[in-house]
Amino acid sequence: MAKKVAILLATGYEEGESLFLLDTLRRGGLQAELVSTTGEDWVTGSHGITARVDRQLDDSLSDFDMIILPGGLPGATNLRDDERVTGWVRRFDSEDKWIGAICAAPMVLQKAGITKGRTLTSYPGGKYRKLFVDSDYREDIVVIDGHLITSRGPATTLPFAYAIIDALGGDSAPLKEGMLYNMAKASTL
């Protein structure tokens, strides 16, 4: 049975980090769903793209194997300020379930109180980095620490997605080839 992944969307989410991620995870054989934190069936991102979600956050996430927090502003801030979201983050962490956060969204992990002593990354810049003074902050594209996967931003969405697929027992190698990732990575663009 395919592993279930919930991508949490708040108003102002980063579209690339959410929708391209959703597409890639589904291509990789995961049962990925968009979950609204707004109570609405349609959620608008930070660049005006509106997406229809699969379910609401008020529904239980207990049957999911992973939750993912996309960045974008004010999306990541809205996720951070939603006590239901930080509650689910703490619950998944305590149950050793997978948690992913990209771009500005690691701020949600910090607010939930799960970053102390952890190795992670986020969108570059002092504004974000100073949130993680009690963490082992890295400049790597993707960082995996136990059941926590973090990444830098929109351009790192594919490596983030591939790391998630592999972490949940899939094999991203054929997907990388089929999506021309290795070719693009080798190019001098």
Where are the regions a protein language model picked out?
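Cytochrome P450 catalytic-domain "roof"
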Residues: 144
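Extended, subdomain-level signal for the structured scaffold at the beginning of enzyme domains
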Residues: 1-95, 108-117, 127-139, 147-189
